[in-house]
């Protein structure tokens, strides 16, 4: 194998789309001091500019409650102000995911995660719209129109995982996609009523789903749509929405008698075995193939991936997770306009906090603020020059990407030997 590069050959500008945003645990954790210390470190060392999280309207944020006597609603944005003030202080901005419901607006008992985010459609759509309008009015008053115009507003999170995806008593949205479109429409119109320049988008789906349907709905019904947002993980090709065995599992689990411990354990073990072998069907570079399709479906709209990672459990904490990032980001340049890694930290209590430092969590940093191998990959990518050579070298599982940093007149070679799990690597 011989690698040669003409340093005078064609280059193209590097758009640092992977640094535009990063994901985090739900909103209330952004009030923690350790969360803030870690996010400040990530902004400084990795260059992240926005942060996205679930649950901005959850009860643990104390945003909205209803008087049991008068039947009137009361609002407080104090905790949100506390978080947004902090973000601006460290040079970051919020990528505002509008979720979940305050419990006073719930139309059922469905919740998600350890912190019980309410995932039902609102029982009072007018009250939801009033909440959105009041929220936007407050942001304008506190931060100014020019500042809020730099933010993004995304309606909900993964509405196709829940009622539409076969999981009636769980998931992120207990309604159908038709219900979601109605929620999106009323929310987007309320945002544009506050300021036409405010940017709103969706459908925030898992597995690149419903992009065409979202565009079609918005065009047909004259609903504002400034960007497409979706998510993808490599195992989506086997586990994602629309895969029959996944849907059947969710359906079977939701209908299972939870008092029958033997049946519950048997189904759980079956699923664990399925997950253990899943990577046999996940090919190298699968996220790039997904992104190519999504880019085409998004048309002329900006394409934001507001969640992605290797999602490989313990291997994600080590060299596999690092090489996955180092290959995926260069390969997806020009396909996505934003690529928000999920998440910056293992300060993540969706199922309660972890007990071990390295446990295969989503974060780039451990709960104790120790950098994992994927963190170092982002550090390395942050140091790349502002130009990329168009010529790419690929040999079996080895890829070489060439960059140029004109500030010090250097050429940088990023060499990545990456292979999907349960597949052979060329050495």
Language model regions located:
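Short, solvent-exposed loop/turn elements at domain surfaces
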Residues: 28-32, 61-62, 238, 422-423
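Mature N-terminal, pre-catalytic/accessory segment of carbohydrate-active enzymes
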Residues: 1-49, 54
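Generic beta-strand/beta-sheet core signal
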Residues: 54, 203, 230-231, 306, ...
């Amino acid at each position: 194998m011989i690698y040669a590069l003409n340093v005078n050959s064609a280059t193209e500008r590097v758009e640092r789309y992977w640094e535009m945003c990063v994901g985090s645990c739900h909103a209330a954790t952004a009030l923690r001091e350790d969360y803030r210390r870690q996010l400040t470190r990530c902004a400084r060392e990795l260059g992240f500019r926005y942060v996205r999280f679930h649950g901005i309207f959850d009860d643990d944020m104390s945003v909205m409650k209803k008087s049991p006597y008068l039947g009137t609603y009361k609002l407080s944005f104090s905790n949100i102000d506390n978080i947004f003030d902090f973000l601006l202080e460290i040079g970051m901005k919020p990528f505002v995911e509008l979720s979940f419901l305050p419990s006073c607006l719930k139309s059922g008992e469905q919740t998600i995660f350890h912190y019980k985010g309410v995932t039902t459609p609102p029982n009072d759509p007018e009250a939801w719209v009033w909440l959105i309008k009041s929220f936007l009015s407050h942001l304008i008053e506190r931060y100014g129109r020019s500042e809020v115009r730099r933010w993004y507003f995304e309606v909900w999170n993964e509405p196709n995982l829940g009622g539409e995806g076969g999981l009636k008593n769980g998931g992120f949205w207990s309604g159908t996609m038709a219900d979601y479109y109605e929620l999106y429409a009323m929310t987007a119109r309320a945002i544009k009523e506050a300021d036409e320049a405010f940017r709103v988008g969706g459908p925030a789906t898992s597995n690149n789903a419903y992009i065409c349907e979202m565009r079609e709905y918005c065009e047909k019904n004259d609903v504002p749509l400034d960007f497409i947002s979706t998510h993808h993980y490599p195992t989506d090709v086997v586990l994602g929405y629309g895969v029959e065995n996944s849907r059947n599992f969710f359906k079977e689990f939701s209908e299972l008698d939870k008092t029958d411990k033997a049946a519950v354990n048997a189904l759980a073990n079956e699923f664990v075995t399925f997950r253990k072998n899943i990577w046999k069907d996940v090919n190298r570079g699968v996220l790039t193939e997904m992104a190519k399709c999504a880019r085409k479906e998004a048309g002329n709209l900006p394409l934001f991936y507001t969640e992605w990672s290797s999602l490989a459990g313990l291997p994600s904490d080590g060299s596999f997770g690092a090489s996955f990032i180092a290959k995926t980001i260069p390969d997806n340049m020009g396909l996505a306009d934003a690529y928000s890694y999920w998440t910056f930290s293992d300060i993540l209590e969706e199922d309660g906090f972890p007990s071990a430092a390295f446990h295969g969590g989503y974060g780039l940093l451990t709960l104790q603020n120790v950098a994992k191998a994927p963190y170092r990959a982002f550090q390395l990518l942050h140091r790349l020059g502002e130009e990329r050579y168009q010529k790419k070298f690929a040999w079996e599982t080895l890829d070489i990407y060439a960059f140029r940093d004109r500030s010090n007149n250097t050429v940088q070679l990023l060499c990545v030997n990456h292979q999907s799990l349960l597949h052979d690597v060329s050495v």
